[in-house]
Curated annotation (Swiss-Prot):
NCBIfam families for the chain: PRK01099.1-3 (NF002208)
Organism placement in taxonomy: Eukaryota, Amoebozoa, Evosea, Eumycetozoa, Dictyostelia
Principal localisation: nucleus
Residue numbers spanned by region Disordered: 1-55
Organism in which the protein naturally occurs: Dictyostelium discoideum
Gene3D superfamilies in the record: 3.90.940.10
Gene: polr2f
Protein name as it appears in the record: DNA-directed RNA polymerases I, II, and III subunit rpabc2
Amino acid sequence: MADFEGGGDDGGYEEFDEGGGFEEEYVEETETTEAYTDIIDPSADANTAEAGRIPNHLRKTTRYMTKYERARLLGSRALQISMNAPIMVELEGETDPLQIAWKELRAKKIPLIIRRFLPNGMYEDWSVDELSI
């Protein structure tokens, strides 16, 4: 067998200067981030969120619920029901959360809001009782 002398392989270990180069880079990085924190308004995100909402009387999208909205709505509501959320319809022996969610959807009693985003960044909020299934 041949002895392994190590050759040029350092095993992933790289030598570095212990002269404090890391601390200098860290100081430079924190100085630049402090300049940005002075400019940011903490309520700016909340203010722009309400500006993107379209009022109910100016809605542009259709009143029909898409199959994707229905699937997400049923899945979310079934998850809530499985975690002991209050049920909004009378049960007739159903124990499956998905079947209960279907029954709530048919009765238009699901207490969720569907948010539809538009290409321009605006959005519309629709309640389940406003949409046709």
